[in-house]
């Protein structure tokens, strides 16, 4: 069998076999001419191609795809020629080949790709080359927007891809014109600030084409107005809505259904797949390729959607809609106002009974407290009263009919949450600000997720920079029931031996003591000052974050920023624009934050990020592990902490020109046997226990970068 090139254009479209010859309508330049004169790498690719084609002519297009992917990522391949700044990376090429093979076989691939591997291109190119319907799911809205607005268009242009694409977010990301109109008609009792935002949204609504609220720059992303002018699956009127034909959610879904490539996020995907919550379920059966980026989040998100929950926000929203319906459509039913006020009051009282904010606890234990149980009973009674009052006015108001359906759902869900006798679930609650959440979560989602995969005959790709523990994938595969998946671990191309330094300081203060924050701040202030800020201090608790921020603000002549002082995006912008700031943060800043260059050259972590032992979700997983005969500390707690630590450390080096130090303020990393599991899971950085050497390393690298930039 021979290969002949029959079209001079630089793109792939079709291949045919005739007289035992493979004819390609466009072979890239590095495959043109006599194949005997090609490089060894090209010959190897051709050899694999011919082996895979064999005598089965139906395989020719898949084989073409395989060879095309190798050529795309070659030294003089199409990406090098068409994507500015693209440099071939062996790990990226390996991942692209693995993705191609899984697409061909309709298999499951779990790929850990270290920072800088270029995993986005490694899955985009094979997916687009295949021509199959593809869903790409991300862990955050930020990555979703970046993928759709930057990465996808780049690859589409490079490959001359002629398919269509769509971006689909959850319904709470789109303006609801009907709910906006309701607020305009009945907004008399709104706070002045919220009412002003309603007017801003009203003005923006006359200009927007897609209703995506992230584009309404005149209103803060965390404004209280957004829940009032967006819909949920519970309060949406569906086809009964007077503005149904103008619905932005409906329009976005139609675009997604018609598109060849759809970009969503994990919450949207799981909500639809598990509880049919988003209304784009028609996409799932049609999709032939499912790709999950930031896939380390999937186990926890899946647990959330395979369970049930009831939140104070849902109940406040229900009461609010009852009041709006009373004021605009059923003004003779004054009991609607009274029962809604009663429900609102009982929600507030129950929240107060839970005590401190930012606390997560065991719901089974909580309900043993007679006082708390009394408040929950009063809340249940108020919900029943609202249900009974709304029932008297059914058919008079679409808004009220929708609210009645939600009340029915919530009262049944609350009764399910109060019945803590059902085995196999974790019962837990969380209090935050003026709100609370009551939830039940299955102890394990492995069986359910395995069935989800089996029910869709598609190719499944899961990828992230943080999936393995101690260079093994078993922790991840066991949690999702994917023991038979193909796994791949690709190291980062960054030179951590020269770009980074890992420090575990000597003479650290004891953990979890009232004076820990004060002593840590005193110990680390000189390093931060000498580095001119440019530092993230990642904390494992809000209490430590607040304590450290207070100490640093009193002692450092630098901008000290703290998570919660403003929105996340605003905080990052201020950090970058300052150029010499210290950002003290927790939780959401451990991952999904990308700060490149000299602006960030030091990441400090207060201690190993073990989940609090009294966390109800952790306790449930520990119980499940023990029932299966496992060692909970080894099999659950350590892997959880390793993945989180890898995420935190990953904030530092985002580019080949970055440098910096990682300081972990926890002796256990070097004094306990399990510390080796953490160290072997981190990038291979040189290590020290000296803060002085760490400061010297940072100053030397800063000087070197200044010389390079000046030259």
Task: Report each predicted region and the residues it spans.
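N-terminal presequence-like segments and the immediate start of the first folded domain
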Residues: 1-61, 67-74
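Conserved pre-motif I regulatory segment
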Residues: 75-111
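A substrate-engagement module of RecA-like helicase motors
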Residues: 75-82, 132-260, 322-323, 327, ...
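Signature of the SF2 helicase/ATPase Hel1-core->accessory helical subdomain module
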Residues: 129, 145, 150-153, 233-234, ...
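Conserved RecA-like ASCE P-loop NTPase motor core of nucleic-acid helicases/translocases
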Residues: 134-140, 462-463, 533-540, 663-665
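A contiguous, basic/glycine-rich beta-loop/short-helix subdomain that forms a polymer-engagement track
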Residues: 227-260, 270-280, 385-508, 515-522, ...
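Conserved RecA-like P-loop NTPase helicase motor core
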Residues: 505-515, 565-669
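Conserved helicase motor "Helicase C" RecA-like lobe of SF1/SF2 P-loop NTPases
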Residues: 540-564
């Amino acid at each position: 069998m021979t290969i002949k090139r029959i079209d001079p254009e630089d793109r792939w479209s079709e291949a045919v076999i005739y007289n035992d010859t493979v004819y390609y309508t466009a072979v890239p330049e590095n495959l043109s001419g006599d194949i005997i004169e090609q490089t060894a790498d090209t010959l190897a690719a051709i050899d694999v191609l011919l082996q895979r084609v064999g005598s089965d002519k139906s395989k020719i297009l898949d084989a073409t795809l395989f060879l095309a992917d190798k050529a795309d990522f070659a030294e003089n391949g199409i990406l090098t020629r068409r994507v500015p700044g693209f440099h071939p990376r062996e790990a990226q090429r390996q991942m692209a080949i693995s993705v191609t093979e899984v697409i061909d076989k309709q298999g499951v691939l779990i790929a850990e790709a270290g920072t800088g591997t270029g995993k986005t291109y490694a899955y985009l190119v094979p997916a687009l080359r295949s021509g199959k319907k593809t869903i790409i799911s991300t862990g955050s809205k930020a990555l979703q927007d970046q993928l759709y607005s930057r990465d996808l268009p780049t690859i589409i242009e490079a490959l001359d891809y002629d398919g269509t694409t769509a971006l689909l977010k959850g319904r709470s990301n789109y303006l609801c014109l009907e709910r906006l109109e309701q607020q305009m008609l009945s907004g008399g009792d709104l706070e002045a600030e919220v009412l002003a935002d309603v007017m801003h949204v009203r003005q923006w609504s006359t200009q927007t084409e897609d209703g995506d609220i992230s584009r309404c720059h005149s209103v803060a992303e965390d404004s209280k107005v957004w829940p009032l002018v967006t819909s949920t699956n519970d309060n949406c009127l569906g086809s009964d809505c007077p503005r149904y034909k103008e619905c932005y959610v409906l329009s976005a879904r139609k675009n997604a259904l018609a598109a060849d490539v759809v970009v969503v996020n994990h919450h949207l995907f799981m909500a639809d797949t598990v509880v049919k919550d988003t209304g784009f379920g028609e996409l799932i059966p049609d999709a032939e390729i499912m790709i999950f980026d930031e896939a380390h989040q999937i186990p926890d998100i899946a647990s959330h959607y395979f369970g049930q929950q009831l939140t104070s926000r849902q109940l406040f929203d229900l009461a609010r809609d009852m009041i709006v319906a009373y004021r605009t459509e059923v003004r003779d039913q004054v009991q609607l106002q009274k029962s809604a006020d009663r429900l609102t009051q009982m929600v507030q009282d129950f929240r107060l009974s839970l005590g401190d904010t930012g606390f997560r606890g065991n719901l089974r234990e909580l309900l043993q407290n007679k006082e708390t149980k009394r408040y929950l009973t009063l809340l249940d009674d108020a919900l029943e009263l609202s249900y009974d009052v709304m029932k008297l006015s059914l058919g008079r108001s679409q808004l009220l009919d929708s609210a009645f359906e939600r009340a029915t759902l919530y009262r049944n869900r609350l009764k399910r949450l109060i019945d803590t006798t059902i085995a196999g679930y974790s019962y837990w609650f969380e209090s935050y600000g003026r709100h609370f959440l009551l939830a039940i979560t299955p102890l394990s989602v492995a069986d359910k997720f395995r069935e989800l995969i089996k029910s869709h005959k598609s190719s499944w790709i899961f990828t992230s920079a943080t999936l393995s523990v101690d260079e093994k994938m078993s922790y991840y595969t066991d949690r999702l029931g994917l023991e038979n998946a193909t796994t791949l671990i690709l190291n980062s191309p960054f030179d951590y031996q020269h770009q980074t330094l890992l420090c575990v300081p000597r003479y650290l203060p004891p953990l979890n003591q009232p004076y820990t924050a004060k002593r840590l701040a005193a110990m680390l202030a000189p390093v931060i000052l000498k580095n001119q800020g440019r530092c993230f201090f990642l904390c494992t608790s809000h209490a430590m974050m607040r304590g450290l921020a207070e100490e640093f603000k009193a002692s450092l002549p630098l901008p000290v920023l703290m998570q919660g002082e403003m929105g996340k995006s605003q905080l990052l912008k201020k950090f970058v624009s300052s150029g010499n700031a210290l950002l003290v943060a927790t939780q959401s800043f451990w991952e999904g934050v990308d700060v490149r260059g000299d602006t960030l050259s030091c990441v400090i972590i207060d201690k190993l990020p073990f989940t609090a032992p009294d966390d109800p979700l952790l306790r449930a997983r520990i119980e499940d592990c023990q029932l299966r005969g496992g060692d909970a500390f080894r099999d659950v707690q350590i892997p959880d902490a390793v993945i989180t630590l890898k995420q935190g450390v990953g904030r530092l080096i985002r580019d080949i020109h970055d440098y910096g130090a990682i300081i972990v303020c926890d002796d256990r990393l070097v004094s306990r046997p399990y510390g080796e599991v953490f160290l072997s899971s981190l990038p291979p950085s040189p290590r020290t226990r000296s803060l002085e050497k760490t400061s010297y390393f940072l100053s030397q690298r800063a000087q070197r970068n200044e010389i390079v930039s000046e030259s």
